[in-house]
Amino acid sequence: MMINPLIFGPLLCLVGVTDVGMAKIGDRLPSLQSIDVSHCRKLSDKGLKAVLLGCQHLRQLVIAGCRLITDNLLIALSKSCIHLEDLVAAGCNNITNAGISGLADGCHKMKSLDMSKCNKVGDPGVCKFAEVSSSSLVSLKLLDCNKVGDKSIHALAKFCHNLETLVIGGCRDVTDASIEALAFACCSRLKCLRMDWCLKITDSSLRSLLSNCKLLVAIDVGCCDQITDAAFQDMDANGFQSALRLLKISSCVRITVAGVRNVIESCMALEHLDVRSCPQVTRQSCEQAGLQFPGSCKVNFEGSLSESDPSVDIFF
């Protein structure tokens, strides 16, 4: 197997590769800065280590869906690839707090980490990672990491003031206390926050976010059934106009047309509004109330909550 590093340059993207294939690549590509082996389900720590040992300039590693990957790979990364900035390990559910902590020991310049659906990752690992990454961390995705709670969010608020994107959908132990702390600490940077299915979140969190985070462009509180119209009251106080472009409030059963009116009057830049499965907010009820949505705003009244919209997904 002959591989010319001039062909691949700084980027290597492989499909269906195994440990044997990675071993043949070995250390022949020392200039690699980005490796994408997502969903290579036969690839394990052993195969990737063979390449990583020679990639001291690696900046990005995408291993999403590589289910055989364990903590050992993250520990190897911390020793061999200290310039790593972006790790996508979504769905690698053999990774635990030990792996995240090990990564933090050596990789101190991390800008982006995606551990979505890694259900063995919880507060101890996230807190350690937040403290070490501190001001460099811009994006953290922890979708359906159900062991993540307030301790993690408080750590982010304490150390990661440059955080722009946070995904904690499905982290059901997160409460208002930590979200409000985050809203104050990251108010000058936070742009995108996904916290659907965070069932302990109330109006208090949303009010704090909307009033403090002036750059907030996307927020998802779908299925947070304690959210009411009160979350959107006084949004236009002191003439403030929200920069919000995306609001997902699907299955927020207490929201009414009055709440939606407050949103559209204060969010003139709104491009996407998701009100699916909101029984009090229908196309008919909005028309009867005479609501005038911004001309560029797409309102989603119907459809399955499992449906994905690429124009919305880009925010998270």
Predicted segments, located by residue:
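N-terminal adaptor-interaction module of cullin-RING ubiquitin ligase components
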Residues: M1-I35, R41-S44, K49-L52, T70, ...
